[in-house]
Amino acid sequence: MSVDELNQSILQYKEQLEQIAQALQLTRDETERSELNKLKSDLIELLELTVESLAATSDDDDAPDTAGRAPPATADNPIDDEFALFMREIKELQTEDSAAGEQAGEQTATEPERQPNDDDADNDDDADDKLDLDGLVGSKCSAPHLHTWGSTAYHNAMVCSLDADDLAHATAKVLFTNPTHREMLPCAYFLEGECRFTDEKCRYSHGEVVRLDQLRDYRAPQFERLRRAGSRALVKQSTRLWCKGTVTEVDFDAKRCKVRLEEGKREQLEVPFEDLLPLDEDEDGQEAAEDSESDTDGADEEEADDEALRKALLVEKSLFHPAPDRRLGEWEEHTRGIGSKIMQKMGYIVGTGLGREGEGIVVPVSAQVLPQGRSLDYCMELREQSNGDKDLFSVEKKLVQLKRQEAKRAAKDYERQRARESKSKDVFSFINEQVFSGAAGGESSRPNRNRPGALSRQELKEHSCKNLNIASLKLSEEIRRTEADVERLKIALTRHRAGTPAADNLLRQIDAKRAEISRMQASEGNISREQQLRSDKKKLTIF
């Protein structure tokens, strides 16, 4: 390096040393002071090396033929003068550094005694910070708002007050200039200082408190975006709320445009630019994405664990309650309802109570059916007489009572029917008992063989003509069937030799069938005679 470059480097190092010395006088933090002292020592060492390099370069340029011996220091040598000046300044800086260190040590030792009173430098810094923060009051910004459904969105707002007691957690109270929902709408009485309600009880906004680091730059309306067809904007309504709409026509000369609202009656309005805030879909989408990313960073894993823990606690809580006699939504088995299925999709666990924590009801609310045409006083008297029974007018209780009444009525009808059947015997049961009792041809048929007829005339008089006709038809069919059996037995008899046990058995069966046929023919004759007598009697009665 040349002599000029070395001189320039030395001057630069001196300026840096002066800056470090000033910083050491203003800094009280031990960590910062140690770093500054280390930087200062490095600069001093670098400066000494630079000065030595400068001296060596000057010696090389001015050296005589003598081997390596520098010329004696004279007052006319500028390098020696500069080196002497540098060493004197280095000593002064070291002296100032030691003095500043002693002063800082004394201040640290006496700090507990002087704790109520701050230093003048601290007072100046705090005053400067307060002056800077006070300048934010009345300024426009973009502040976040947490909606009732859980999402956060940024809206234009104005800072109305600050709380800067703790700068690390400073907050600001803002009023939204383009409120889109009722909870964002500034209270007119609060702005005039006449609102009688507190911030919590008033239906309108007295200012929303947000952290100072959450504020963003104010988004000024850019009406050039309205040139695009179908651009969206916020429109001020008579209710002071701003609703979304689509711009259909723009007049930049008159500064008016026509907007079709997206909600309500979807009517088309003509509004001035003062009541319009153009929206940028790209910015809105970007803000929404930033909000969603900031909200979901590191929350996905915790969300799954919290959901599993919540379900386990709900199931554990449900085990301490007695099991209900019926489950919620059991009536959907007989209908097309899907309410319980939707609830399960939304996270409901069968058997637990309603609500997020399972603190709600487990069984469905029972419907109450009051007596028709009665007053409520009468119904209350009935409930008092029943000792405050809550299920007195319950639909389920009435249904159980109706089922019991139906069961008792059915049992009585059955007993009455059986008694009626036991008293009145029809012709079919009589035929089955008297005529067909000896169909097997055994010993049970022997007492009937001695009787001349199975059905007497006196017994037939108790039955109607219709029953007699049916009985006669059945007897005819039974006679034909029995005769067919006799013919089949005769054919079987031809295949056996006479005198064998099989032939004797077949002969006994043929005799029994023939006796049965004779009895049925006798009964059929009695029925025919009874029918003929009734027919003749009817003709004589008509004559």
Swiss-Prot record:
Subcellular location(s) per record = Nucleus
| Coiled coil feature spans | none
Please name the GO terms that the record assigns under molecular function: DNA-binding transcription repressor activity, RNA polymerase II-specific; RNA polymerase II cis-regulatory region sequence-specific DNA binding; zinc ion binding
- Give me the stretches of Low complexity compositional bias: 65-76
Biased segments, Acidic residues type: 118-131, 277-304
User: What biological process terms from GO does the record include?
Assistant: negative regulation of transcription by RNA polymerase II
Q: Cite the residue ranges of zinc fingers (C3H1-type).
A: 186-209
**From which organism does this entry originate?**
Anopheles gambiae (African malaria mosquito)
Q: Name one GO cellular component term.
A: nucleus
Name this polypeptide is given: Zinc finger CCCH-type with G patch domain-containing protein
Identify the keywords attached in UniProt to this record, alphabetized. Answer: DNA-binding, Metal-binding, Nucleus, Repressor, Transcription, Transcription regulation, Zinc, Zinc-finger
Chain segments carrying region Disordered: 55-79, 95-132, 272-304, 438-460
G-patch domain residues: 335-381
| Protein function | Transcription repressor.
